C-alpha cells in the first residue's frame, strides 16, 4: 500500500536539493566523474547559448527575424545530427569512446569562433557546427548515465543527473550575463574553457571505465 502524503513528505519531495542529498546512496568515483562531465557540458553550453543571440545582434546588427531564422536552421541541423551521428554511435555501442571526442569538437569550434567574430559567414557556419555537436553530446551523456544506473537506485541516479544539468544551466546563465557585460566575447571564452574541462573529465571517465584486458578476453 502506498504511504499517505504528509506535510513532511511533500516538503521532502518538493525540495530541489533532495537529489543531491540522496546521492550518497549510489555515488561512486565513476559517477562523480560522469556527473562532473554532465554539469560542465550544460554549464558551458548555457553560457554560450545565452550570449549568442545578443552577440550576433550587437556585433552584426542582425534583426530579430534574422536571429529567428538562424536559430531555425541550427535547430534543423541539430535534429539531423541527432538522427544520424548520434543514433549511429548509440547503435554501435561506442558511446563511452565517442562522447569525449564529441565534446572536444564542441570545444574546438568555440575557440574557432573567437577568431571569426568579425566575419559573419564563417562565424555562423562554425556556430552551426558547434550546435550540431552539442546536440549529439546530450543524448550520449544521458545514455551513459542511464546505462550506469542500476536497480532500485536508477530513479535517484536519473534525478541527480537532471539536477546537475539544472545546476549547470543556472550557473551558466548567471555567469554569461556578468561576463557579457564586461566583454562581448568573454562568455565564449568561459564556455570554451568549461567545455575543455568537460572533455578532459570525459577522457578520464573513458579510461577508468574501460574494461580490463582480462575481462575483455572473456
Locate the predicted segments by residue.
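A late C-terminal transmembrane helix in Major Facilitator Superfamily
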Residues: 151-181
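A membrane-interface helix-boundary motif in multi-pass transporters
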Residues: 178-196
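Intracellular helix-loop hinge segments at the cytoplasmic ends of transmembrane helices
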Residues: 54, 139-148
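Multi-pass alpha-helical transporter architecture, strongest
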Residues: 191-218
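C-terminal transmembrane helical hairpin of 12-TM major facilitator-type secondary transporters
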Residues: 96-141
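Helix-to-loop junctions at the C-terminal end of transmembrane segments
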Residues: 81-95, 180
